[in-house]
Amino acid sequence: SLSHGKYYALGSGPARAMATKVKDGAVEPVEELYKELEYRDSHDKTVLVIENDAVPPVEIVEKVAAACGVSPADLTIIVTPTSSLAGGVQVVGRVLEVAMHKAHALHFPLENIVDGTGSAPVCPPHPNFVKA
């Protein structure tokens, strides 16, 4: 999650797999999952999709860019309110990701998964964030 002051949002996309931090003098992924999987993306540009109805403050943009090792100009942020069609598609589009997280949490050997597919209904947009 991303937060600064009163701003809070969830993020997804390649930036999550690129973001690192220094802990006890060592560089490691920000997300524990990527640390456990010993996985990290590396590129000179990246993208982050944010579930929120407001553009993030510059402090979040700078923090994400720094964690990914890119300049803020090379970070594309897509803002998708959950109450919008794009936000709804973005949420249900991660159904397979959620299944993989569950398999990992249950200690299923992920190397045994060679293919996957998922489906979920796309709810119609609703102006109320909670109902969406």
From Swiss-Prot:
Q: What is catalyzed by this enzyme? A: 5,10-methenyl-5,6,7,8-tetrahydromethanopterin + H2O = N(5)-formyl-5,6,7,8-tetrahydromethanopterin + H(+)
Concerning Pfam families, the annotation shows:
MCH
Answer yes or no on keyword Cytoplasm. Answer: yes
User: Which GO terms of type biological process are on file?
Assistant: formaldehyde catabolic process; one-carbon metabolic process
- Identify the main location: cytoplasm
Q: Report one GO cellular component.
A: cytoplasm
Enzyme Commission numbers on file: 3.5.4.27
Q: What's in the keyword line of the UniProt record?
A: Cytoplasm, Hydrolase, One-carbon metabolism
Q: In which pathway does it act?
A: One-carbon metabolism; formaldehyde degradation; formate from formaldehyde (H(4)MPT route): step 3/5
Spell out the subcellular localization from the entry.
Cytoplasm
Q: Which InterPro entries match?
A: Cro/C1-type_HTH (IPR001387), METHMP_CycHdrlase (IPR003209)
Question: Superkingdom of the source?
Answer: Bacteria
Gene Ontology molecular-function annotations: methenyltetrahydromethanopterin cyclohydrolase activity
Q: Which Gene3D superfamilies does the UniProt entry name for this protein?
A: Methenyltetrahydromethanopterin Cyclohydrolase, Chain A, domain 2 (3.30.1030.10)
What is the recorded function of this protein according to its Swiss-Prot or TrEMBL entry?
Answer: Catalyzes the hydrolysis of methenyl-H(4)MPT(+) to 5-formyl-H(4)MPT.
Q: Which family is this sequence assigned to?
A: Belongs to the MCH family.
Name of the protein this chain belongs to: Methenyltetrahydromethanopterin cyclohydrolase
